[in-house]
Every structure is written in structure tokens, then in C-alpha cells.
């Protein structure tokens, strides 16, 4: 297999690739994450993943580059990473007692080809008290995460139900990625 590069500094994505025993190196993409005029959350995450992969692939032509992006949506509103604790609190209050969607887009890119895909997962939160939200925000955990929570961390206690790929909510749909990567590297046509 060609050298595999993760175009992300996300510790969660690194952990998931290690969990799947995928050898890789990290080259952080310096792409500014801006959401343009896309028609759907799926289009947004796939476009951002592709931008990240493309930026790194330009200087690593003999490698397979992985770009990924995750967003949370509720009621047609996109919830990215909060800019501060106040915005994190607003997001968590918005999600309290409700079901929201998490989209993770993935792009695999080499000199020969590019494959993009996404996973959509529904997450339902318990009703959260203001105190629970404040205590969680004080941990600083939500400040670098889309939707202001980490399902794999202390934010797990907010989750009542999940429908879809848990690891996609963490940041990378690892089971599907491994299958896509095998097909990508084998030269098989992608359906």
C-alpha cells in the first residue's frame, strides 16, 4: 500500500486510525474551514474533507491522503466548533432533550483518483440542566468539538440514544473507511 497520510491534527481521528491498525503519518492541513453555499450538510462535510485532503495531496503526490470533517446540525442550523464558552452553552441548551444529526465527510485522494463519502448519525440528548452544562463547559472539553460535546468523553453522559455510526460522531467512520481504503488501494472501481 502507498504511504497513508491523515490531513488532520485531530487526536480523535489519530486514535481511531490507530484502533483500526492503519499505519499512517500526520500532515496537518492548513485549510481555512469556511462553509460556502452548499445544498446540504453532506455536501458541506464532503467539500471540507476534500479541501483538506487536496491541500496536503499537492505536496505528497505518491501518497493516499485522508481528509475529514464533522458538523452537527439541528433544525437546519449548523453547529460547528464553538468560538467560546458562551457559544458552547448556547449549543448545548439548544440540543438538550432533542435529536440532532452528526455528519462526517471523508475524502481519500491520490494522484490517480479521489473518493468522497459521508456518514449521517442521529444523536438524542437527555434534558440537560444548566448546572450540568456549566460543569461540562468548565472541563473545556466541548470547546474544540463540533456541537460542543465529545461523545467519547465526558459528553457521553448527555446521550440518551444514538442511531448510526458511533465512530462517525467521534470524527471518523472507521469501519467504512477501512473498507473504502482497501478498495481504493486495490484499484477496484468504486460504486
Curated annotation (Swiss-Prot):
**Can you tell which superkingdom this protein's organism belongs to?**
Bacteria
**Reactions catalysed, as given in the entry:** dTTP + H2O = dTMP + diphosphate + H(+); UTP + H2O = UMP + diphosphate + H(+)
Q: Which GO terms describe its cellular component?
A: cytoplasm
Name the residues that span the membrane.
none
The entry's active site is: 69 (proton acceptor)
Q: Which GO terms describe its molecular function?
A: dTTP diphosphatase activity; UTP diphosphatase activity
- Per its record, how is this protein called by name? dTTP/UTP pyrophosphatase
Organism this protein belongs to: Bacillus cytotoxicus (strain DSM 22905 / CIP 110041 / 391-98 / NVH 391-98)
